[in-house]
């Protein structure tokens, strides 16, 4: 890393990019970047840190810069192109992360689902017991002086995580996603195996994932889960409307009893992964148990609020497995309320590839609404629509429009979950405004 130069982030509002920018800023490096004008939830942290966000413009690029290119941008992007013409260093997000994790005990969290929640939980817990830097995919990042640990999210998309050589890796699951890049599940597993082979001390994987069980590695692989053949096991699990409680064993050794203020089976597993890696690093488990109690969650992962008589949940879920986990968590916390799902399909390629799985997961809700498909920067149209998905859903499937959220007014004292990785929040805000205005009129 070069403290004399300015790090310029192309696409600085991206979830990982904003976190990385904050870390470099905390470490004393000069940081600024560019992005679209549209407000994103990652922006607040950058603004609070005093990091400038400029519109895309080749004139932003100066001689004293190192350019960090966001994963969505190629060499034809105007600033990246200008940097190459000027002979400046242009490096990717993963390459930059790899540079800053070398001085610590690094823990990379990978998985098709759950990596942001797990890395956020691990960062919170370890920060409470030892100096810890972290880079989480919800836009949060912190560079702590003399950190013992560095927790970071390792993204499999386009094999970005093969740039990393962490001390430890947590792998929550392997699933077929990103069909615009991966050809099949074997292709995905091959990517994870590459990361496994580059991990230096140990790997922690969910034991019930048959693809993770097939991984080859040069270091010990520890399985965590609820089955008798798992190395780290959660037993005597009690799920209530306040959270979950469970005992943890490492083989036949009792490690401790833990309470978590979180919902859904997936959060028990995420917590178990955190307990496992901290145990192997000989961190006091009483301290771990104490820190687990205070975790408030990560941004856009089961974020709750109450408006009028409704519970509104915002969640990043955009894959069938994530939708299932989110609805399961809502049912645990609100067993006596109807669960209404409002889902924004994310990318045409994913909607086509997982159409039946989406319909099955969404049908776990009591009523389902859809929005139009949110296309990625790499695709502008496709041969599928939300109406096509809606026809396969047994409990609704009506497509909502932003200027008419009134169908949701049929529900009272229930739970509405807005799910998606695009701009689903604008639908949520439109619904909240509608509810608030009605409440004012009725009072």
Curated annotation (Swiss-Prot):
The keyword Amino-acid biosynthesis does not apply. It is an enzyme of class 6 (ligase). Coiled coil: none annotated. It holds the Pfam family Mur_ligase_C. Pathway: Cell wall biogenesis; peptidoglycan biosynthesis. The keyword Zinc-finger does not apply. ATP binds at residues 111-117. Its EC number is 6.3.2.8. It catalyses: UDP-N-acetyl-alpha-D-muramate + L-alanine + ATP = UDP-N-acetyl-alpha-D-muramoyl-L-alanine + ADP + phosphate + H(+). It is found in: Cytoplasm. One of its GO terms (biological process) is peptidoglycan biosynthetic process. Its main location: cytoplasm. Keywords: ATP-binding, Cell cycle, Cell division, Cell shape, Cell wall biogenesis/degradation, Cytoplasm, Ligase, Nucleotide-binding, Peptidoglycan synthesis. One of its GO terms (cellular component) is cytoplasm. One of its GO terms (molecular function) is UDP-N-acetylmuramate-L-alanine ligase activity. Belongs to the MurCDEF family. Cell wall formation. NCBIfam families: murC. This is UDP-N-acetylmuramate--L-alanine ligase. It comes from Ligilactobacillus salivarius (strain UCC118). The lineage of its organism: Bacteria, Bacillati, Bacillota, Bacilli, Lactobacillales.
